[in-house]
Design a protein with these regions (language model features):
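Short, well-structured N-terminal submotif of metal-dependent ribonuclease cores
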Residues: 1-37, 50-63, 126-127
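Short acidic, glycine/proline-enriched helix-loop-strand junctions
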Residues: 62-65, 69-76, 81, 89-90, ...
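Acidic, PIN/NYN-like endoribonuclease modules and their adjacent C-terminal/linker elements
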Residues: 1, 101, 105-135
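Alpha-helix/helix-capping structural signal
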Residues: 8-9, 40, 78, 118
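Histidine- and aromatic-rich ligand-binding microenvironments
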Residues: 3-6, 37-39, 93-95, 116, ...
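Active-site neighborhoods of divalent-metal-dependent phosphate/nucleic-acid chemistry enzymes
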Residues: 70-115
Length: 135
């Protein structure tokens, strides 16, 4: 089953000084599953990388995506409608996180690779009781 990555996990992977860096890096090295990133996560992660780590890190991220090392998952119209439902239900959830949830629900994924324990732990997906938050 594929692993869906959110912004925090991608950022932690890029920033060796991030508190989550070693955990995310080691977890992803050990996994042999397809890595997926929602298309909505890309600009958010790229922005944070450029702002905090510099243009070279953002460029490496773009090169990684272009090389296909991480697959990109697009939103469907149903996903966008589900995002609206999630935003209506959870006032703490932003659009990018809602898109992560919507894609995970559509793909029937049970786990998310994320550093955001606070928000994703509070969401109740439609296909399971709760997401397993990795690493």
């Amino acid at each position: 089953m594929p692993l869906l990555l959110d912004t925090g996990a991608l950022y932690a992977l890029a920033d060796a000084d991030d508190d989550w860096h070693v955990r995310v890096r080691d977890f992803l090295k050990a996994e042999r599953q397809l890595l997926l990133v929602p298309v909505t996560v890309i600009p958010e992660a790229a922005y944070l990388m450029r702002k905090r780590l510099g243009a070279a890190v953002e460029t490496r991220f773009a090169e990684t995506l272009a090389a296909g090392e991480i697959a990109i998952e697009n939103l469907t119209r149903r996903d966008i409608a589900r995002c609206a439902e999630l935003l209506n239900t959870y006032d703490f959830l932003g659009y990018v996180d809602a898109s992560v949830v919507a894609i995970a629900e559509r793909l029937k994924l049970r786990a998310l690779v994320t550093t955001d324990r606070r928000d994703f732990a509070r969401v109740r997906p439609i296909h399971i009781a709760a997401f397993q938050l990795l690493p």
